[in-house]
C-alpha cells in the first residue's frame, strides 16, 4: 500500500505561494524536529500492538493553521499520523493556551463520536496538549497528537462528479454527475444516504452548555471554554450571542 502522504499537496509548491512569515513558521518547525525523528519513531512503535518499527516520512508533510502533520509508516505498511502544534502566529492566534484547548476539544470530540455513533473516526493513540517537562517526547517538544489513519476513496474516485451538485440542496446544475452511466447511481445514492446518516448521528450528541469539549484522564467529556478564545462555557444561546461575541 502506498503511503497516505503520497496524496498530500506538494510541499515545495505549497510553501512557494505562502507569505514568507507563514512559510518560515513551518520550515523552522520541520528543522527543529528533524534531529528527533528517531525518538518520535521509537515513541510511536512503543504503542504498536506488535511493537513494530516505523519511520517518519520526513520529505512529505503537510500542515494547517495550528499543526504540522507527518505520516508514520510501520513495517507492516499501516500508517499513523502525528501532529505537532506550531508556534503562535501572533499574540492572539495559536497561543499555547489556545492550542491546548483545541487539542483537548478534538480528542474529546473523537472520543464522543466513537463512543456514541457508528461513524468511523481515527483512534487517538497518545497526546500531550501543552509543552511541559512531562511531555513524553521530551521537555522541549511541542504539543502533539498521535493517532491512527483512515484511508478511503472520494466520491470522485468512484466516477461521480459530486462537485457539480449544489452543496446546499443537492440539486444537479448543468451536468450529469453520473456522466450518463446509470450503473453509478447506487454509488451516488449510498453516498448521499451515508452523509445523511452521519448528520443524523452527530445531531444526537447534545449537551446543555455551549463551548468546546474537554476530556479528563478517565475519559469523561464535559463542555468547557471555547477553543478559540477561551470564552464560556455558556448556559444559553442568548448568553453565547451576547458574551461569546465580545458584547457587553
Question: Predicted regions span which residues?
Answer:
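Short intrinsically disordered, low-complexity coil segments enriched in acidic
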Residues: 1-2, 187
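Juxta-kinase regulatory segment immediately upstream of eukaryotic protein kinase catalytic domains
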Residues: 2-59
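ATP-binding pocket architecture of kinase catalytic cores
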Residues: 57-248
Amino acid at each position: 500500500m502506498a503511503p497516505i502522504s503520497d496524496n498530500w499537496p506538494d510541499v515545495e509548491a505549497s510553501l512557494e505561494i505562502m507569505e514568507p512569515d507563514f512559510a518560515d513558521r513551518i520550515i523552522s518547525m520541520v528543522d527543529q524536529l528533524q534531529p528527533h525523528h528517531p525518538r518520535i519513531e521509537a515513541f510511536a512503535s512503543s504503542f504498536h500492538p506488535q511493537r513494530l518499527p516505523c519511520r517518519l516520512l520526513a520529505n512529505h508533510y503537510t500542515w494547517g493553521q495550528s499543526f504540522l502533520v507527518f505520516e508514520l509508516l510501520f513495517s507492516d505498511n499501516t500508517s499513523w499520523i502525528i501532529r505537532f502544534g506550531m508556534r503562535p502566529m501572533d499574540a492572539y492566534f495559536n497561543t499555547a493556551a489556545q492550542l491546548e484547548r483545541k487539542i483537548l476539544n478534538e480528542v474529546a470530540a473523537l472520543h464522543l463520536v466513537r463512543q456514541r455513533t457508528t461513524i468511523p473516526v481515527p483512534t487517538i493513540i497518545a497526546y500531550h496538549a501543552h509543552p511541559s517537562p512531562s511531555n513524553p517526547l521530551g521537555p522541549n517538544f511541542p504539543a502533539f497528537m498521535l493517532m491512527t489513519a483512515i484511508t478511503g476513496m472520494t466520491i470522485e474516485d468512484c466516477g461521480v462528479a459530486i462537485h457539480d451538485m449544489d452543496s446546499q440542496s443537492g440539486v444537479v446544475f448543468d451536468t450529469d454527475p453520473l456522466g450518463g452511466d446509470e450503473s453509478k447511481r447506487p454509488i451516488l445514492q449510498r453516498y448521499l444516504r451515508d452523509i445523511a446518516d452521519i448528520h443524523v448521528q452527530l445531531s444526537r450528541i447534545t449537551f446543555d452548555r455551549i463551548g468546546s469539549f474537554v476530556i479528563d484522564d478517565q475519559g469523561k467529556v464535559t463542555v468547557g471554554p471555547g477553543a478559540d478564545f477561551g470564552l464560556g462555557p455558556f448556559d444559553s444561546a442568548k448568553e453565547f450571542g451576547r458574551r461569546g461575541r465580545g458584547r457587553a
